[in-house]
Design a protein with these regions (language model features):
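Active-/binding-site microenvironments in catalytic and ligand-binding cores
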Residues: 1-252
Length: 252
């Protein structure tokens, strides 16, 4: 069995708009904490060292994470949208299907025909509960200032189409599933049309689905199909999303 990590690291130097803030406390500081907690002296601990611990400040959409339907809108399919802790875990383990769009320019908006063409090349037909992975290699720019601006996006029409094939979980190595936000804003200012801002996310109002955002290492997958994906989100009560460490699993 071979396992490939599909997550970006939680790291202070990430250039996403809402990066994590990680404060590291040393073993020596841990001894001071333990001594204060237990009414002891720091010198009571071997080598005056105890636990190391980190304090992390971040949003539920920092780093590699899964978006719940609640993230998109308060209602989905006419009912209260489900939060991350309410989703069936069965959604987050299944056959992976890699769509390699790394040849597309940053900001390109993927259409139904783009996915259909790739499926023809793969000689593959999507089936319910497949987990779709969109590769643009945006993860290679995690430490660059323009990281959130250089991914390909998926159109609302293509998102509808994927859901209609039975897909419940779809992911991207970009900062977001839609085209970059500044590009959306620029288009909206020109046309004032309602179907531009966050269009693919808002598909979740009509059809329940989840996104994985900020995947990584999709270039390391040797084949587009024939592997499993596990992408279980952290159980956060009433949350719009949850951090995940997705992996691709190849059973030999």
């Amino acid at each position: 069995m071979k396992i490939i990590d599909l997550s970006v690291p939680m790291i202070n130097t990430a250039k996403e708009p809402y990066p994590p803030k990680i404060e590291y406390e040393s073993h020596e500081q841990g001894a001071e904490q333990a001594a204060a907690l237990l009414d002891l002296e720091k010198s009571d601990f071997p080598d005056e060292k105890a636990w190391a611990v980190e304090t992390v400040t971040l949003t539920t959409h920092t780093g590699t994470h899964v978006d719940a339907p609640w993230h998109y809108a308060p209602k989905s399919e006419g009912k209260r949208a489900r939060t991350i802790d309410e989703l069936p875990l069965e959604w987050f383990y299944g056959d992976g299907v890699l769509f390699d769009f790394s040849d597309k320019e940053a900001g390109y908006e993927l259409q139904i025909k783009d996915f259909e063409q790739k499926l023809t090349e793969m000689n593959y037909t999507l089936k319910p509960k497949d987990i779709v992975l969109v590769r643009s290699d945006a993860d290679k720019h995690l430490y660059e200032e323009n990281y959130a601006m250089i991914h390909v996006g998926v159109s609302a029409e293509a998102t509808h189409w994927l859901i209609d094939q039975g897909i419940k979980v779809m992911g991207t190595d970009g900062w977001g599933w839609d085209i970059p936000l500044p590009q959306q804003a620029e288009q909206y200012k020109k046309t004032r049309e309602d179907n531009i801002l966050w269009a693919a996310h808002f598909v979740g109002k009509e059809k329940e689905y989840c996104q994985i955002e900020k995947l990584a290492n999709l270039d390391q997958l040797p084949v587009p199909t024939g592997f499993k994906v596990a992408c279980f989100p952290i159980n956060i009560k009433d949350a719009s999303g949850g951090w995940a460490r997705p992996v691709a699993i190849f059973y030999e």
